[in-house]
Amino acid sequence: FLADIKGDLSGMCRPGVDSEDMQKRIQKFGLAECGFNYHNYPAVFWDIYGDMGIPARTTISEMGPILLAKLMDLNDTQSDILTIVFKIADDRNLLLIDTKDLKAMLQYVSENSAELAAEYGNIAKQSVAAILRNVVALEAAGGEEFFGEPAMNLSDWFFSGDMSGRGSINILDCRQLVHDTTLYSTFLLWMLSELFETLPEVGDMEKPRMVFFFDEAHLLFKDISKALRGKIEQVVKLIRSKGVGVY
């Protein structure tokens, strides 16, 4: 998986073109003796906004209240109430697909807070209203495109990309996404968390099953909350035992 900040990684889907500079590099590193040749690689293009690739989407329910609270930078009280909102939806078998579903659920909880208090505890309408404002801000930042169906199925990435058995290189166009570092960071954390939860433990492998390369990685941590940064660091350290490398 490659996060493409500049838009220059997409060229690997086509064979390279020889040049004088390339010949110098081939000779310098002795690549001719290794059978070097120009060829393309199986590539799949993704884009959260759906402009330059397959829309990279997940649902509100799959993201969960913990990551969603970090994405919206909610305080402890608001985070607890968001968790309760998810619990109420779950108890009623209601799937939260997109931000419209979440806003409707928040409005329902606010309007019925008195009746719900006996089972779920006190739910302050002011806190629900604050969460609702954050959801609106999230929509404006690209959340309206990110949350929805069909959701990404990360297990599909482990199937070979062509008839020769080569795996696919998944490229995420980040030229627009990089301007919203919180959404960028949360998307990264969601992907790694999903893989961590679903993949079996494999210990130290000779070669990883999957690798993530993040171009301009310092931008991931620019202007994001300390809690979100800490969670990313934790998952990156733990996911190695699942056969996933992060670079």
State the predicted function of each range.
Residues 7-237, 241:
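P-loop NTPase motor domains
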